[in-house]
Regions:
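Beta-sandwich/jelly-roll carbohydrate-recognition scaffolds of carbohydrate-active enzymes
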Residues: 1-168
C-alpha cells in the first residue's frame, strides 16, 4: 500500500564514539605505531590492535546477534610505562536530526547494583518519527567509571585493564 515503501535510508545515531587520552594528551590516529586489524565473520567480531604514547590497545567490536541493533566494544589496555588513560564516549548524531536530546541516567539492575546509561534521542521526518540510542560502560578490573560518558584506567608499567561499552 501507499506509504509502505522505503523512500530512503536514514543514518542512525552512533552510540559508540570512543575517544582516548593518555596522561591528558588526546589520542591522535597519526601517532599510531604498527596497527593490526582482522575480521572474524564467524564470531561477528572486528579486532584492532595498536600502540601509542606508552600504551597498547586492543579493541573488539562485536555484533550481538541475539540482540538486534545492539553492539559491544571490548577494550583492553596494557601499559608500556606508568600511564593514566581516559576513555570518553560521545554519541554521533546525523545533522538531519532535529530536537536532539542528550541525557544520562542511573538505572537499577536486578542484583541491586546501579549503572549509568548515556541516552541520545532525536526526531526526523519533520518530527513525525523518533530514534533513540543508548550506551553504558561495563568496567572490568583496573577500570573506574568517572561519569556516564567516561572511564579512567591508571596502570603501572606492564599492567593491564579492560572495559566494555555496550550500545543500542
Amino acid at each position: 500500500g501507499f506509504g509502505d515503501d522505503v523512500s530512503r535510508i536514514l543514518e542512525g545515531i552512533n552510540p559508540l564514539g570512543l575517544t582516548m587520552a593518555v596522561d591528558g594528551h588526546r589520542f591522535d590516529p597519526s601517532e599510531v605505531r604498527p596497527q593490526h586489524q582482522s575480521v572474524d565473520m564467524r564470531r561477528a567480531v572486528h579486532t584492532t590492535r595498536f600502540s601509542t604514547d606508552g600504551v597498547t590497545v586492543v579493541y573488539r567490536i562485536r555484533a550481538l546477534r541475539n540482540m538486534p541493533y545492539a553492539l559491544m566494544t571490548e577494550v583492553e589496555v596494557t601499559a608500556e610505562r606508568d600511564a593514566e588513560v581516559l576513555f570518553s564516549n560521545g554519541h554521533t548524531v546525523p545533522g538531519e536530526f532535529a530536537d536532539t536530546l542528550r541525557e544520562s541516567r542511573t538505572v537499577g539492575c536486578e542484583d541491586g547494583s546501579r549503572i549509568a546509561v548515556q541516552r541520545t534521542s532525536g526526531s526526523y521526518n519533520r518530527g513525525r518519527d523518533h530514534i533513540v540510542a543508548s550506551s553504558t560502560f561495563l568496567c572490568g578490573e583496573g577500570c573506574e567509571a568517572v561519569s556516564p560518558e567516561s572511564v579512567r584506567i591508571v596502570l603501572r608499567k606492564g599492567g593491564r585493564a579492560s572495559f566494555s561499552l555496550v550500545g543500542t
